[in-house]
Regions:
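Juxtacatalytic substrate-recognition/specificity segment
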Residues: 15-132, 161-164, 174, 178, ...
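Alpha-helical scaffolding within the catalytic cores
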Residues: 11-14, 77, 154-155
Length: 199
C-alpha cells in the first residue's frame, strides 16, 4: 500500500491565486487580495455559524473557487439555470461561485450559502438519496442570515395572495423560472426558520 497523496487541479484557463485559513482554501484569479480575504473571512464566519448553530462541521479542507463573474462561472459548468450564481459539490469538498468585486455583499452571503451545502452533504449522506431540496436550501439561506428585503416581500405577497408553492414541489429541485426559483428559496428558508425556532 502506498502512502496517500493529494493532487490539486486548477482550471488552467485562469491564473489562480490561493489564500488559506483553517479548513478553507480560497482560489481566485480576479480582484484584489483584500477582496479575496474578505470572502475568506465570510467563509470562516459561515463555518463558525454552522458549527455553533447547527453542529455542522468541516470534516476535511474545502476548496472555494471564485470566478470573476457569473458568466465565467457558467462557462465552466454545464446545464445550470441562468440564475445560478454558485454550486457546491459536497462529495468533493468543492464550492464554485461567480463573484465580481462589485458584488461583494452578495458574494459574502453566497459563499456561506454554498459552504453550508457542503457541510449538509457531509452530515446527510444516504444511499437512498439526498435531503429534500427545501431543507438543504432552507438551511443554506438560514446560514446566510435570512432573507433580503425583496425576497421577504415576495414571500409576504405569496402568503397574502395564497400562491405559495407546495412543500412537495420544493422537495426535488427548483424551477428554472427565476421568479419561482426565488420564491422556492424564500419558502424553504421560512420552513427551516420555523422548525429551528419552534423545535
Amino acid at each position: 500500500v502506498s502512502t496517500q497523496q493529494t493532487v490539486t487541479w486548477l482550471d488552467s484557463e485562469h491564473n489562480w491565486k490561493t489564500l488559506t485559513a483553517d479548513k478553507l482554501n480560497l482560489h481566485y484569479y480576479s480582484g484584489t487580495q483584500a477582496f479575496a480575504q474578505d470572502l475568506l473571512n465570510a467563509a470562516k464566519s459561515g463555518l463558525d455559524f454552522n458549527s455553533t448553530q447547527s453542529g455542522l462541521n468541516a470534516e476535511s479542507p474545502i476548496d472555494l473557487y471564485i470566478f470573476a463573474n457569473t458568466n465565467d462561472l457558467r462557462d465552466a459548468i454545464l446545464y445550470e439555470p441562468s440564475w445560478t450564481g454558485g454550486q457546491a459539490f459536497a462529495d468533493h469538498d468543492i464550492v464554485i461561485l461567480g463573484i465580481s468585486q462589485s458584488d461583494l455583499e452578495w458574494g459574502r452571503d453566497a459563499i456561506v450559502h454554498e459552504l453550508t451545502h457542503v457541510l449538509v452533504g457531509h452530515l446527510t449522506f444516504s444511499c437512498l438519496g439526498g435531503v429534500p431540496t427545501w431543507l438543504n436550501e432552507g438551511l443554506a439561506v438560514y446560514s446566510e442570515g435570512g432573507l433580503d428585503p425583496a425576497s421577504q416581500q415576495q414571500l409576504d405577497d405569496a402568503i397574502k395572495d395564497d400562491t405559495l408553492l407546495t412543500v412537495r414541489s420544493l422537495s426535488a429541485g427548483f424551477s428554472e423560472v427565476p421568479s419561482k426559483a426565488y420564491l422556492s428559496y424564500s419558502q424553504s428558508y421560512s420552513i427551516v426558520k420555523f422548525l429551528i425556532e419552534t423545535y
